[in-house]
Amino acid sequence: MFSKILVANRGEIAVRVMRACRELGIKTVGVYSSADKRAFHRVYADECYYIGKADPRDSYLNIDRIIEVAKKSGAEAIHPGYGFLAENAEFAERCEEEGIVFIGPSPEVIRIAGSKVRSRESMQRAGVPVIPGSPKIDTVDEAKEWAEKIGYPVAVKASGGGGGIGIVVVNSQEELEEAFRKSKKLGESYFKDSTVYLEKYLARPRHIEVQILADQHGNVIHLGERECSIQRRHQKLIEEAPSPALNEEMREELGKLAVKGAREIGYTNAGTFEFLYENGNFYFLEINSRLQVEHTITEVVTGIDIVKYQIRIAYGEELRHGQEDVAIRGHAIECRINAEDPVNFYPRSGRILHYRSPGGIGIRVDSGIHMGYRIPEEYDSMISKLIAYGETREEAIARMKRALYEYIIEGVETNIPFHFAVLNDEEFVRGNIHTKFVEERNIAEKVKEYLRIFRPIKARLDEIFMESEFTWEEISAIVTAIDAYEQELERGIEERIWQAIFSLGA
């Protein structure tokens, strides 16, 4: 086994990988930018090195500097986490050239996965259904021809795109020329790839993905699916496993499609095959050639540590599980806790003044933040992941709602009220979700109602907790008031909460 691994990332995912290393007895090397001098991953690592300024191009995307640190520290392998260099074929190649193991798939597989056109072609060869669409399109006239074949509405997509960047929905031929040019421009600007193609636009699909593990000895298994339909602007916010839309037969069918696709391209390590599901049909969407943010919920329902498996596979070990050993038990939900305005989703930065994470049975928190930490504006707004497990979906929802009540993050706005609004929506509870759920269910207006109740109560509680001394009677009264707040808020009985809180000052 490796004796030392460098984690080329920051925040909660850096801590997550380091935890797996610690359990395997592997020393860890961390890296940090000027914005992360007081970040938790810096002190959690066995050794940590400064790699540059806050701008990611000077630090977490600086291949030369990261390789330099790996060689200086004696790290035998690099785990890229997600984001930054995780799906960068050039970085994976550079690691190979320097004699450092890249914990992930091969550079060629990363290139296939990173090209929507190439990955679609690979899945078609494997017999995996894809959304009706075109090969790469070079001219507007070609685009018009294919759009007529496919049928409007169509989506013009940048081949190298991700996170919704480079996707333009077109409802008629009159809109196509501008959309074609816009998508090509976005692809070139963001991904240095101006290749575009067309797909039939699915208006209200479910977004379902399959986690796979593949070793270097030809063994490939799947760990079931995750539903990621609760999104805003193509960014996932709530994920769950398993999907409430699938039965066992459908689950097995989808898993086999993902395994077939992985074998077609020679995939190794952990990966995710994403699909859209509409009207009883699965359509391949894309491959994520890295560890997913939401890998946690698969770990919870299978009991399999995906990060440890990444490390073991990269070292050359065979899978310890066959497909028959994988069982889905219970239900798990993940809420991404972001530092952002919960209504318009604009990111927020600032110092965390008070922090208390939730706990209790069935709750997991993956976080890289702490009280006093300043959330930098240079990076993604996600600051932690809250995971709830239950024997049933209903129990998982109940535990998540309870954990959200307990989660205290002060100093910056977060999207916790957004999660309250979604989890209390009757259609979400019924499992009737799709990628347009947030817009169609008018979640933003429901969030505003939660904020109307939260803000004055929170201000009064802050005032109480700023007092320098408490008697035991006052502490007891505060706990009683908070209990009343949590229990009564959901029933909409606001007046009783106010009475309980204001009685403290009497």
Curated annotation (Swiss-Prot):
Residue ranges annotated for the ATP-grasp domain, each copy included: 120-315
ATP-binding in keyword set: yes
UniProt-annotated catalytic positions: R290
Gene Ontology MF: a single term: metal ion binding
Pathways per UniProt: Carbohydrate biosynthesis; gluconeogenesis
Annotated S-S bridges: none
Domain Biotin carboxylation: 1-443
Residues that coordinate or bind ATP: K116, E199, H234
Keywords, alphabetical: ATP-binding, Gluconeogenesis, Ligase, Magnesium, Metal-binding, Multifunctional enzyme, Nucleotide-binding, Pyruvate
Record-linked InterPro entries: ACC_Biotin_Carboxylase (IPR051602), Acetyl_CoA_COase_biotin_COase (IPR004549), ATP-grasp (IPR011761), BC-like_N (IPR005481), Biotin_carboxylation_dom (IPR011764), Biotin_COase_C (IPR005482), CbamoylP_synth_lsu-like_ATP-bd (IPR005479), PreATP-grasp_dom_sf (IPR016185)
Record carries keyword ATP-binding: yes
Enzyme class: ligase
EC number: 6.4.1.1
Cofactor requirements of the protein: Mg(2+); Mn(2+); Co(2+)
Catalytic activity: hydrogencarbonate + pyruvate + ATP = oxaloacetate + ADP + phosphate + H(+)
GO biological process entries: gluconeogenesis
Protein role: Pyruvate carboxylase catalyzes a 2-step reaction, involving the ATP-dependent carboxylation of the covalently attached biotin in the first step and the transfer of the carboxyl group to pyruvate in the second.
Quaternary structure note: Heterooctamer of four A and four B subunits.
Protein name: Pyruvate carboxylase subunit A
